Amino acid sequence: MPNLTLADLQGEIQANVRTALAEDVGGGDLTAQLIDPQREAEARVITREHATIAGRAWVDEVFRQVDPRVLVTWQVEDGQRVEPNQMLFQLKGPARALLTGERSALNFLQLLSGTATRSQHYADLVAGTAVKLLDTRKTLPGLRLAQKYAVTCGGCHNHRIGLYDAFLIKENHIAACGGIDRAIAEARRIAPGKPVEVEVENLDELRQALEAGADIVMLDELSLDDMRTAVALTAGRAKLEASGGINEGTLRNIAETGVDYISIGTLTKDVRAVDLSMRLTL
């Protein structure tokens, strides 16, 4: 599946920010009203740790919606690796607006940069191999597209976006349809042209999936030896995706079996936010 780009996300970004501001600002920022509305200020945002940045567009949109007079000047790009205490961006505008938008802007940036940083770490572990690391649907509710974009900033790739853009036929689907061949045939009938992926648990099921014409076969917790056999058996007839039992210790060995993809839920579901700080100057 193709990776998301910012061009795909403009409406999503606006909606994400509207939701964030509605839950944080509500009917108005009480504390900001203590400040003279004519008071101008500047601010600098830094990172306190090593990170890979993602989320600039969400920060820009926060301040656009809070007060379009706020000027945001970036010192880094999405996908850029940064060092502790490095300045990420500067703000200039009404002090009230800077303080009202601060938390929402940093929430987006720290979360999405956390996703990008974890993705970059995993991508570094398989550097030099041909494998592509994929995200999953294990995302934060309401922020799937944002997190999937952040994954690409860290050098990994997008799997299907949701249940609507590709088939992923798993054990229960196969049982309900009466077999792998029937499930694939029905998928082709329902949505010709949509990618069809089938999850298998052994080499016999792999053979069935290949004979039925699957586009992608997910190898669920196969041993390294079985993965190597699967690569030889498939011989390019379908793409192979490894899934299950994957961690930092096993990732490189799995990549070196020759599979095309490795899907990793932890890229988006176990995110640790990057530590950021904003300092205001009046």
Swiss-Prot record:
CDD domains: QPRTase (cd01572). GO terms for molecular function: nicotinate-nucleotide diphosphorylase (carboxylating) activity. One of its GO terms (cellular component) is cytoplasm. Hexamer formed by 3 homodimers. Keywords: Glycosyltransferase, Pyridine nucleotide biosynthesis, Transferase. It comes from the Bacteria. It catalyses: nicotinate beta-D-ribonucleotide + CO2 + diphosphate = quinolinate + 5-phospho-alpha-D-ribose 1-diphosphate + 2 H(+). Substrate binds at residues 103, 136-138, 160, 170, 199, 220, 243-245, 264-266. Involved in the catabolism of quinolinic acid (QA). Pfam families: QRPTase_C (PF01729), QRPTase_N (PF02749). Pathway: Cofactor biosynthesis; NAD(+) biosynthesis; nicotinate D-ribonucleotide from quinolinate: step 1/1. One of its GO terms (biological process) is NAD biosynthetic process. InterPro entries: Aldolase_TIM (IPR013785), NadC (IPR004393), NadC/ModD (IPR027277), Nicotinate_pribotase-like_C (IPR036068), Quinolinate_PRibosylTase_N_sf (IPR037128), Quinolinate_PRibosylTrfase_C (IPR002638), Quinolinate_PRibosylTrfase_N (IPR022412). The keyword Glycosyltransferase applies. This is Nicotinate-nucleotide pyrophosphorylase [carboxylating]. Its EC number is 2.4.2.19. It is an enzyme of class 2 (transferase).
